[in-house]
């Protein structure tokens, strides 16, 4: 499928319909990845009864655009994906991996049509994450010396690191539920990001720390536990919805109670 971002950037994706859907899931991939990164998650969500939209963020995969902002303008892409699926009148789940998780938080905070959020290895503040990436790539001393380079990138994209701070927006998601997943051996986005996000999230909120897993690796290392957490979260979310909002008879139809 093809659809425009909120600012007109052309986006490319895959639509995986369910004949009798429980809801619809929008899946957001990570930085320097594409929709294939979350295909495995989409397959599992499809098995759980969800129609799924996987798409490439701007400047990734087959989508248009030449510049990534690592979560800042990508929120416009996620909101456009929500626009795309909202026509079906089904409960909307946002799933995001790494950068996509941060984007999912900010998009859900700004759009009440999103009913629930699941993130995997999301950053709390882009500034914190960027500092970690510099040190991971160049070492602690050289990484700190190279940090000013990021300000050149911000100047070229006319953005600010403070434009991507899910920690400031996550509280707006409540009373809609959120599940935060993070590996305790994540060296790209340390687990402290998850604790910080959880602290600021409203109820209902769930934090699952995947013991021994690195960045977005929990679903590979321990898939049964991972998808068990996801399935339990989804069941609780849908069961808590008013009956008139959760009776479906087709891929885009709802019968009022």
Describe the residue ranges of each PLM region.
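Catalytic histidine neighborhood in serine/cysteine hydrolases
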Residues: 198-216
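Conserved alpha/beta-hydrolase "acid-adjacent" motif
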Residues: 187-193
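Catalytic nucleophile-loop/oxyanion-hole region of alpha/beta-hydrolase
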Residues: 48, 60-91
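The serine-hydrolase catalytic nucleophile loop
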Residues: 31-44, 57
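N-terminal cap/lid segment of alpha/beta-hydrolase-fold proteins
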Residues: 1-20
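Catalytic histidine-centered segment of alpha/beta-hydrolase-like enzymes
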Residues: 213-227
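Short beta-strand/loop motif that positions the catalytic acidic residue
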Residues: 173-174, 179-182, 186
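Hydrolase active-site cap/lid region
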Residues: 109-163, 168-171
């Amino acid at each position: 499928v093809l659809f425009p971002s909120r600012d007109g950037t052309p986006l490319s994706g895959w639509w995986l319909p369910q004949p009798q859907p429980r809801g619809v899931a929008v899946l957001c991939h990570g930085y320097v990845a594409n929709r294939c990164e979350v295909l495995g998650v989409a397959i599992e969500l499809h098995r759980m009864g969800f129609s799924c939209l996987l798409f490439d963020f701007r400047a990734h995969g087959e989508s248009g655009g030449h510049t990534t902002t690592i979560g800042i303008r990508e929120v416009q892409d996620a909101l456009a994906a929500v626009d795309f699926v909202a026509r079906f009148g089904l409960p909307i789940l946002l799933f995001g991996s790494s950068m996509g998780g941060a984007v999912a938080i900010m998009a859900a905070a700004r759009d009440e049509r999103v009913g629930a959020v699941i993130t995997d290895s999301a950053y709390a503040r882009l500034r914190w994450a960027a500092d970690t990436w510099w040190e991971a790539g160049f070492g602690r001393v050289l990484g700190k010396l190279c940090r000013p380079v990021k300000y050149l990138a911000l100047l070229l994209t006319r953005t600010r690191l403070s434009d991507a701070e899910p920690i400031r927006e996550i509280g707006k998601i409540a009373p809609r539920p959120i599940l935060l997943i993070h590996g305790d051996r994540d060296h790209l986005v340390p687990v402290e990001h998850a604790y910080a996000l959880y602290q600021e999230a409203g109820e209902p909120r769930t934090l699952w720390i995947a013991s021994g897993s690195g960045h977005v690796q929990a679903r590979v290392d321990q898939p049964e536990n991972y998808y068990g957490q996801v399935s339990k979260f989804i069941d609780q979310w849908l069961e808590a919805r008013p009956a008139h909002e959760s009776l479906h008879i087709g891929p885009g139809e709802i019968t009022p109670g």
